[in-house]
Amino acid sequence: MSDINGTRLPWLATCPCVGEDVNPTLSRGER
């Protein structure tokens, strides 16, 4: 699981387009 997390962080940073799409989704889930 740790490996996936480490790979996911840099992946999102490299793909700001996808990160923006996931940002609103995560914010909604937290709210």
UniProtKB/Swiss-Prot annotation:
Described function: Probable toxin that belongs to the MSDIN-like toxin family responsible for a large number of food poisoning cases and deaths.
Keywords: Toxin
Originating species: Amanita phalloides (Death cap)
Post-translational modification: Processed by the macrocyclase-peptidase enzyme POPB to yield a toxic cyclic hexapeptide. POPB first removes 10 residues from the N-terminus. Conformational trapping of the remaining peptide forces the enzyme to release this intermediate rather than proceed to macrocyclization. The enzyme rebinds the remaining peptide in a different conformation and catalyzes macrocyclization of the N-terminal 6 residues.
UniProt record similarity statement: Belongs to the MSDIN fungal toxin family.
InterPro entries, per the entry: Amanitin/phalloidin
Residues that make up the propeptide removed upon maturation: 1-10, 17-31
Cross-link (Cyclopeptide (Trp-Pro)): 11-16
GO MF term set: toxin activity
Record-given protein name: MSDIN-like toxin proprotein 4
